[in-house]
């Protein structure tokens, strides 16, 4: 009976695994590339949010096949936006990048474009994103745990400012810089923001842009977790910066996606087992897409998208990057757009100096082991 139950659970989980697995990347070693470059299979959840002229507006992170988390400030007055995925290497001669039309944007209802409080937004793609080695979802904590999981290898990723473009970012290959949380922070913070600092001596330029993700690994699981979205600072390395704490918005995310559909997978039981039990009880490679939140923001826009084009130039526009890619975006017909608040670009991403690369854990869990671990936890919990 137990074996039959386990097999049924396995089949059920496999049937939903495309949306349940998160925080796993193919890269298994620390790539010691020059200038803190990110290898092609690292950070497969980072996307570029662009307007219809293919101008880069902000970064975002994939939470599921349909949902992306980004900043509200960069998405005001943007009637048509797309998500370009698999952006670790933007060289069109080597990589063909897929675009997905965004048909719904849900900014936080209390977003303040003056103070930049609650600067967070959900984006829903019109069609499901196809996951592969270059495109995956990242995990995030589905609630505030009594004992938060220990994290390691925290990085911020972004485009690299160059002398040729000044403060503008050059879209080529993502860079990464090691960062750490700071308990005593001299910066003025809003509620639900945290303070962090670059960790190494000043050698390289810093990476700062709206929505630049701060990503860490959970020590017990080696799964990647979206810790935050860059909010302010990062002009110099080493230096302080603020980021929007994603964990503080987990209930909001769950509620919004549940109401808009499809809802994000909520695995709070497994999250509790994995993160709150002693290590010998929780040393399981469980992927926790801990998301969800409700209440619909008053900014549910529908967007249409034009054709996919090949990357040919990096012309700057609106202090962003202008580029084209090769395929037709996953899209449907246009629909009317609601009136949006005034657009406010709050972060210029000025170049600084310094930074370094944090090491990356070498352990890589196969999906088969993850699925089996999930079933073992399920059976052991008596659910």
UniProtKB/Swiss-Prot annotation:
Entry annotated with the keyword Signal: yes
The residue ranges flagged as biased composition, category Polar residues, are 323-334
S-S bridge residues: 154-216, 185-195, 206-237
The chain positions of domain Peptidase S1 read 21-258
Annotated glycosylation sites: 113
Decide whether keyword Magnesium is in the record: no
Keywords (A to Z) from UniProt? Disulfide bond, Glycoprotein, Secreted, Serine protease homolog, Signal
GO terms of biological process kind: proteolysis
Its localization reads: Secreted
What GO annotations for molecular function exist for this entry? serine-type endopeptidase activity
Q: Under what name is this protein listed? A: Inactive serine protease 54
């Amino acid at each position: 009976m137990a074996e039959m139950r386990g097999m049924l659970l396995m089949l059920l989980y496999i049937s939903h695994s495309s949306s349940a697995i998160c925080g796993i990347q193919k890269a298994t070693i620390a790539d010691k590339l020059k200038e803190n470059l990110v290898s092609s299979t690292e950070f497969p959840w980072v996307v570029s949010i662009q307007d219809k002229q293919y101008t880069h507006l902000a970064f975002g992170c994939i939470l599921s096949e349909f949902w992306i988390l980004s900043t509200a400030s960069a998405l005001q007055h943007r009637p048509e936006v797309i998500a370009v995925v698999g952006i670790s290497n933007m060289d069109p001669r080597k990589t063909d990048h897929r675009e997905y039309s965004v048909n719904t944007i849900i900014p936080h209802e209390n977003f303040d474009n003056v103070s930049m409080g609650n600067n967070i937004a959900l984006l829903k793609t019109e069609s499901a994103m196809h996951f592969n080695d270059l495109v995956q979802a990242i995990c995030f904590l589905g609630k505030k745990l009594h004992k938060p999981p220990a994290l390691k290898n925290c990085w911020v990723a972004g485009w690299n400012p160059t002398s040729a473009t000044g403060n503008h970012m050059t879209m080529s290959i993502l860079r990464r810089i090691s960062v750490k949380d700071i308990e005593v922070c001299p910066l003025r913070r809003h509620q639900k923001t945290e303070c962090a600092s670059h960790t190494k001596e000043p050698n390289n330029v810093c990476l700062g842009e709206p929505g630049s993700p701060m990503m860490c690994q959970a020590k017990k699981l080696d799964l990647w977790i979206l810790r935050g979205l860059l909010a302010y600072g990062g002009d110099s390395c080493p230096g302080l910066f603020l980021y929007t704490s994603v964990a503080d918005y987990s209930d909001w995310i769950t509620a919004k996606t549940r109401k808009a559909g499809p809802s994000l997978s909520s695995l709070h039981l497994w999250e509790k087992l994995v993160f709150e039990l002693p290590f010998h009880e929780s040393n399981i490679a469980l992927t926790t897409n801990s998301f969800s939140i409700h209440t619909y923001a008053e900014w549910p826009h529908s967007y249409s998208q034009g054709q996919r084009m090949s990357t040919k130039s990096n012309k700057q526009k609106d202090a962003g990057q202008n580029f084209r890619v090769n395929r037709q975006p996953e899209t449907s017909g246009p629909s009317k757009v609601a009136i949006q608040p005034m657009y406010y670009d709050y972060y210029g991403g000025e170049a600084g100096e310094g930074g370094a690369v944090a090491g990356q854990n070498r352990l890589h869990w196969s999906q088969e082991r993850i699925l089996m671990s999930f079933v073992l936890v399920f059976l052991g919990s008596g659910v």
